[in-house]
Amino acid sequence: MHERNRRLLPQVFALLLFGCMSSQAASASADAAPVSAGAQLPDVILISLDTTRADHLSLYGYPLPTSPNLARFADRAVVFQKARTVVPLTGPSHASLFTSLYPHQHGLFRNGIPIREDIPTLAGMLAQQGYDTAAFVSGWTLKRKICGLDSGFRVYDEGFTQRYKFLNQERPAEEVTRAVADFLASGSYRRPLFLFIHYFDPHAPYRRHSVQWEELFDAAARIGWDIDKEVLAYDNEVAYMDHHLGSLLEILGSQGLMSNAIVWILGDHGESLGEHDYWGHGRRVYEQTLHVPMVLYAPGKMPDHAEIGELASTLDVLPTTLGLLGISPPPGHPLEGRDLSGYLASGKPLPAGRQYFETFKGTWRKFTRILAPEVPDEPSLLGCYEGHIKYILEADSNHIEIYDISVDTSETENLASQMGSGFSDAELLSWFHKGRSLEPVTVDLSTEDVNQLKSLGYIN
């Protein structure tokens, strides 16, 4: 595919590979351990900003005003400066968010396959505690039939509009916010409420919003920045989303849902905008696609404002939420993330440790061959963070890249030939295989589903 068309079709091919958990996890009950009777549980609100890279938000120092509403919200919240996703794809990253498992553990490697019903999710855990649960999604990859993440939700609102005729069905932020507002105004819910809201706008193809476009263009001109129009188009979508995020936060406040609440706002993955000669996400694991915004608001449980400089992961969201609620995870459910609630409340530094990531890249033929049992279904790219050192292994070629991201945020100087590796490729692959127990299965998709996945770049 020609590189100049890459923003219109991200360079991601679909691997329809679905797996099951190990027998211990698969047999585990979805019932989370109950809290004490009469406990006043707060509402839980999780807002996902699809395809949103941290360094293109004004909250994280970007010179253009792409996220003023998120920045205002963050003034009274905990801001994670170094949050990372574990996989740069929408379906797998959200499955990891809702299960605190890596893709090779929950089995949702690629967009287009639903997660197993017997894997406990955050929605199911909260429903077991008496929460009402409602989700509002805006991208085809999170459609219930595609991802299966509707499990545990009483309401799973996925009303899409055909923005580009028969292709790229999605809901713009304005419509998502309106749907949430209508739901809350109807009063057809009970408290405590778990509310999941998903914005998809920064995902390619980017469309132009005149108000935000002019504001950003003028801001760039004022600082003498001749900004690339494709980059401006991405920023324009981020700013449009932020505008409606501001409206959403006002609506939540007017409904009394912010006074006793746990609110997460975070990105599921980022977007490469030409760095490393790549546009899109899914086929690279550089910082542009892994470094995401993550903000936590929990009045009375967290400091009024704090900035966390240690490494954090989207896998930490589920266990931290349960920790804030005083809920134990289901027996046998192997959470990979950490409960950060005690560290955040006390102001202690977050614990150090390795954090892993993975993705596939390559051709559709290669991915389909992976479905055959005689072909090892290993990721093409995997790696880990250890402190400020980042390791990347290209499994096909055993090529290793090592970066010191504390001084080389653009990952331009590979240190593999200059320093001893803190891991071996065998060690990384051992970690991968130790946690997996996958059985390839097939899933029937409608012609419409296939066309939508093609339009989003997930099937060649």
Regions found by a protein language model. Give the residues of each.
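Catalytic domains that recognize anionic headgroups
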Residues: 19-460
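Bacterial N-terminal signal peptides that target proteins for export
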Residues: 2-12
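Bacterial N-terminal signal peptides
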Residues: 10-21
